[in-house]
Each structure stands twice: as structure tokens, then as C-alpha cells.
């Protein structure tokens, strides 16, 4: 998959850090009319998700919010989340903060990310790499720690620029039976540290982050790492992703959602910074990080239909089609990897914020089941 080096600080109902169903156990602010609405509040979270390689992910966390004197948005938002994956047998922890000062619209962000779930497979480099051996051959046990301070500045309504330094450290275990060990050594394996700069431009006009029916989103991000710490040759990475939504009815009874993304690395990039395609976030129906290259692209389409407005919530069906590939300098390939499938979705109390989707995607290699809050995009 395209691993997000820049992990945006998400509002908790659709938790980008846990990638799970975030169930708020305390009520949300329904209005700002009473004095109680402006008091600091701490909300506990509980989550669960499923994908074929990582399997069941169980998570919990809290979000703490403070307001200025009768002012929106909040002056402080703190988030702490932890999750454990039963299939990968490892964890993910995220601590994040958003701080705003009175007056200027600038947001000061801080994020600490520690995880063993960012890179779990390695099939070699290439768009037609072999995947016929037992799954244990391709497994990777890597722990990553990311420290990411940044400043976000609004450029226009719904258009934001984020930039700052970053520090990243990874430790990859040398398991002798894996492809990573038998075909290596690979630059970046073992202990590897890197520092650099990052920037991101984000345009978001969607009407809902978890289950959009209208609007669009465009994100362009870049990172650059000089020859410092473990980095021998400077390298950079750029990625872009765009999605749009068209619906019929109000509220929507049918929504066509399409998304496309691409990424590329330049210079002496370590193996964990290559472009990966395949898995729950790019091309479903394939293993996580199934294909690795210097450049990559993917596209997704979903047709989401409302089937019934039951008393407890909306029930619907979804059809999907995914496609993607990677490019490497020493390989000539015209293959695009595709998958298709469908599933069900449910919006509790008729609120799209409360949407849960369960889909199956079939590719030439396997069929995968995916459970998540909202939709993929």
C-alpha cells in the first residue's frame, strides 16, 4: 500500500490512526448554546476492524477537547489511541495534539506514531513479483517510530497547507526464512534512522469524512531526506490522491465514488520507503504490500446504494472495483492488477457518521474480507 508518512490528525469518529470503528462512549456536543457545552471534555473510544493479513484489530483510546472563550474550533484537541492486531501479533500507538491560539487560524500539530503494522509483507521489487510461496516467507517484522511536528495554515476555505520536520526510526528483524533475508541484504533493513522535511496540501469539500455523498478531496504530499543518520544518499517521495462523489436523491439513495492515487520515490530510498500497492488501502483482494516499485498508481470505484431505511438505521449494498500497479527501472511490464466485489453497509440512526461497511474483494490471487468504519474513501 502507499504507506502514509504524513498521518493527518483525524477527528475521532472516523479514526485514521486506528483504522477501526470508533465508538464514542460519551455524548458529543450537539450545540454550543449552554455553558456546559464549552467545558473541557474527555471522550473514551473503543474500536474493532478486520482485514485478511492483519486480521482482527482491537483498539481503545481517548480524546480530550478544550475550547477558548465561546470559540470554535477547539483551542486544544489531544488524542491517544492504541490497537493490537491478532494476525500480525503486534501493536500500534498514536499520540497527537492540535493546538490553536486566539486570533491567527494557524494550527500547531504534534504526532508520535509507534507501530509494527506499517510494513508487514515484502514480496520483492517488481510489478510481477512471485507470490506462490507460503505466506510466512513474505512476512516482515518491522517496528517504526515517527515523530512529526507540523504547522497547518489555511490558504482558503477547505484548503490547508501543512509543513514541518520529521524524524523516523525503524527496526527490521532478520528472520532467516523470509524472502527479505534470503534475497537481501536490502538497504534500510536492520536499524535505520532518517530525518527530513515534509509538506502537504489538502483540499477537502466532502460533506462527510466517513461516508461522503457529495464533494471531492485532493491531497498532494512530499517528503525529502538528506544524507543524515542512516541515510547514505538523499532521497525524496511525492504522492497524490484525488476522490470525487456524485449522488442521486436527498438524502442520497445512490452514490458513485471514484478515487485515484499515485506515488514515486527518487534517490537512494530504503526498501521500506518504496511505493507499495496491494491491500486494504489501495487494491483490495491482494496481500498487503503485494507489489513494490519506484513508482505506483491505483484507482478505485464504488457504487453505494440505499436498500432500506429501517427503524435502527440505513441499510445498503456496495459494489467495488480496484486496479493498480507499480513500475521499476529494470522491469518491462504492462500488467494492471485488478479486483472486484461488493458487500453491505449500515448507518446507525440514519447518520452517515455512524456508517460501517463489510465488503469482499476477489482478485486472481485470493478473496479478501474487509470491515471498517465508513468506506475506504
Predicted regions located by residue number:
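Outer-membrane beta-barrel translocator domains and adjoining extracellular loop/strand segments
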Residues: 73-75, 92-95, 120-128, 173-180, ...
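Outer-membrane beta-barrel initiation region
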Residues: 2, 30-118, 162, 172, ...
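Extracellular loop and loop/strand-boundary signature of outer-membrane beta-barrel proteins
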Residues: 81-83, 132-137, 182-188, 224-230, ...
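Outer-membrane beta-barrel "beta-signal"
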Residues: 198-199, 342-346, 351, 366-377
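Transmembrane beta-barrel strands of outer-membrane/channel proteins
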Residues: 46-50, 78-84, 97, 108-127, ...
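Extracytoplasmic gating/loop element in the C-terminal half of outer-membrane beta-barrel translocons
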Residues: 246-328
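Outer-membrane beta-barrel transmembrane strands
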Residues: 50, 54, 134-168, 190, ...
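Outer-membrane beta-barrel translocator/channel fold
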Residues: 83-93, 109-145, 262-278, 356-360, ...
Amino acid at each position: 500500500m502507499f504507506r502514509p508518512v504524513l498521518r493527518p490528525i483525524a477527528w475521532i469518529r472516523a479514526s485514521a490512526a486506528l483504522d477501526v470503528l470508533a465508538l464514542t462512549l460519551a455524548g458529543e456536543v450537539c450545540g454550543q448554546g449552554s455553558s456546559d457545552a464549552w467545558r473541557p471534555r474527555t471522550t473514551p473510544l473503543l474500536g474493532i476492524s478486520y482485514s485478511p493479513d492483519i486480521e482482527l484489530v482491537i483498539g481503545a483510546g481517548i480524546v480530550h477537547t478544550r475550547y477558548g472563550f465561546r470559540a470554535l474550533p477547539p483551542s486544544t484537541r489531544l488524542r491517544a489511541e492504541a490497537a493490537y492486531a491478532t494476525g500480525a501479533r503486534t501493536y500500534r500507538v498514536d499520540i497527537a495534539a492540535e493546538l490553536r491560539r486566539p486570533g491567527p487560524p494557524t494550527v500547531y500539530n504534534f504526532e508520535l506514531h509507534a507501530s509494527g503494522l506499517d510494513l508487514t509483507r515484502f514480496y520483492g521489487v517488481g510489478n510481477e513479483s512471485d507470490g506462490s510461496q507460503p505466506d510466512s516467507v513474505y512476512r516482515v517484522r518491522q517496528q517504526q517510530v515517527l515523530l512529526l511536528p507540523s504547522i497547518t495554515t489555511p490558504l482558503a476555505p477547505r484548503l490547508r497547507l501543512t509543513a514541518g520536520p520529521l524524524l523516523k526510526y525503524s527496526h527490521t528483524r532478520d528472520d532467516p526464512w523470509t524472502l527479505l533475508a534470503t534475497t537481501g541484504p536490502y538497504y534500510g533493513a536492520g536499524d535505520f534512522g532518517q530525518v527530513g522535511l515534509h509538506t502537504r496540501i489538502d483540499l477537502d469539500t466532502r460533506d462527510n469524512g466517513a461516508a461522503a455523498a457529495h464533494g471531492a478531496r485532493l491531497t498532494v504530499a512530499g517528503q525529502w531526506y538528506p544524507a543524515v543518520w542512516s541515510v547514505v544518499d538523499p532521497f525524496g517521495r511525492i504522492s497524490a490522491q484525488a476522490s470525487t462523489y456524485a449522488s442521486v436523491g436527498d438524502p442520497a439513495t445512490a452514490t458513485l465514488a471514484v478515487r485515484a492515487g499515485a506515488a514515486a520515490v527518487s534517490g537512494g530510498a530504503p526498501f521500506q520507503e518504496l511505493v507499495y500497492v496491494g491491500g486494504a488501502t489501495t487494491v483490495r483482494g491482494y496481500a498487503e504490500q503485494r507489489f513494490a516499485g519506484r513508482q505506483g498508481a491505483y484507482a478505485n470505484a464504488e457504487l453505494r446504494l440505499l436498500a432500506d431505511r429501517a427503524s435502527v438505521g440505513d441499510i445498503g449494498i456496495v459494489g467495488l472495483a480496484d486496479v493498480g500497479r507499480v513500475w521499476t527501472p529494470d522491469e518491462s511490464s504492462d500488467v494492471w492488477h485488478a479486483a472486484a466485489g461488493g458487500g453491505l453497509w449500515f448507518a446507525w440512526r440514519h447518520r452517515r457518521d455512524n456508517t460501517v461497511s463489510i465488503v469482499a474483494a476477489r482478485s486472481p490471487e485470493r478473496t479478501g474480507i474487509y470491515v471498517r468504519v465508513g468506506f475506504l474513501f
